[in-house]
Swiss-Prot record:
Database matches in Gene3D superfamilies: Glycerate kinase, MOFRL-like N-terminal domain, MOFRL domain
Listed transmembrane segments: none
The protein's name in its UniProt record: Glycerate kinase
In-chain residues carrying the UniProt-annotated modification Phosphoserine: 60
Gene: Glyctk
Subcellular location as annotated: Cytoplasm
Reactions performed catalytically: (R)-glycerate + ATP = (2R)-3-phosphoglycerate + ADP + H(+)
Molecular function per GO: ATP binding; glycerate kinase activity
Xref: InterPro entries: GK-like_C_sf (IPR037035), GK_N_sf (IPR038614), MOFRL (IPR007835), MOFRL_assoc_dom (IPR025286), MOFRL_protein (IPR039760)
Amino acid sequence: MAAALQVLPCLLRAPSRPLLWGPPVARMTSGMALAEQARQLFDSAVGAVQPGPMLQRTLSLDPSGRQLKVRDRTFQLRENLYLVGFGKAVLGMAAAAEELLAQHLVQGVISVPKGIRAAMEHAGKKEMLLKPHSRVQVFEGAEDNLPDRDALRAALTIQQLAEGLTADDLLLVLISGGGSALLPAPIPPVTLEEKQMLTKLLAARGATIQELNTIRKALSQLKGGGLAQAAYPAQVISLILSDVIGDPLEVIASGPTVASAHSVQDCLHILNHYGLRAALPRSVKTVLSRADSDPHGPHTCGHVLNVIIGSNSLALAEAQRQAEVLGYHAMVLSTAMQGDVKRVARFYGLLARVAAAHLTPSLAERPLEEEAELHQLAAELQLPDLQLEEALEAVAKAKGPVCLLAGGEPTVQLQGSGKGGRNQELALHVGVELGRQPLGPIDVLFLSGGTDGQDGPTKVAGAWVMSDLISQASAESLDIATSLTNNDSYTFFCRFRGGTHLLHTGLTGTNVMDVHLLILHPQ
């Protein structure tokens, strides 16, 4: 189970025990109690997708210890096992794999986020750490979720190991969210800096994770099936913790063990769509021009078994169960929340108002116009309308507090130079939406957090807000509009109520996208 979430001023180092909520203010009591419960639910979601237990449920040895069973497949072990991995959850996955398979493990290389070993040690998570004399070499890199020289060294070491394997060898590949940044190996003559700049430009213009990964794969030696190709003819078992909506194998960490289905024309279409084709470096044009003659063909991945071992849906199911234990009527709306963060925030604001009206039908007329807009917006965001309608009907029948859960990965179009992440920006936008008009005698809280514990280039997982955000920010002379225009949500939440609305978890050792909680509690 993940360490209990802590909420504390962002400029302080997270202590080993939860920090108290700060000065006792009577009118804040109910909000703080709700926030404590929301943090418990977020913590339970993260705890459900810890890497070790998930890997242990997937792998098993026969009584002789000479056969490895993975789902319905069996592999012979003859001290012929090699291991590579990359991602935010891979340290714990590798530790679990080593515990089970150490006698057969010849060599391993993993690429994990900078500082994660120290963070796990500090949190007392010994089960997430490799043994002192492990055969697995650990590289830490990709500081602030960005590929760097350390991650490049790790990727090239992984490539070298894979290319040295034979038909008698077995390669266990561990993949989780964050793996793409931790496995950068640009095709020469493209440099890491050129590839990183192109990715940054695309992200700033609102490119989806699928579009970003299409470009990354086209310019990478290892993504888009490249790692599988490098390991051929060895057998490859790829265990994947999904951080992508719908769990598409070819998208998670840019699909290093899955043949790419995208062509150069797909890449050019994306670059044209975001107005970047004319600005491409000569090296990128060179690689794209010759890519069609040397694709990672489907035939190169027939020796690979890809297995999803965990996802956002598993995390939300556990949060729902815990919410019901706490006395909430809890429902999961979607595990596919995506789209522009402003539209997603508008959806949650409308949902809160419509749900509040359903909870207090005697005090307000049903907001038919807003309910119609809610359904239209759900369609725009590709959310199941039937599921939304069933949730609203359940809210209307509820005789107590309600918790609506969702997961996914909205996108932010960067237009300023501030500091923040999509979870903090979403929370700030939702806070504005909640304050547009009174919600009646109901306390409403919204929380958005990244299950990896790192929201963008910050040291926090996300943030939470209530419907009094606008008035409280005004009382503290904080300008929400300017913060949003400058994409400066982190700075805002650092200053707002002394940083107590930020979610501090530290690196969690896992990653299954984001968790959103909307709590409605009748007063």
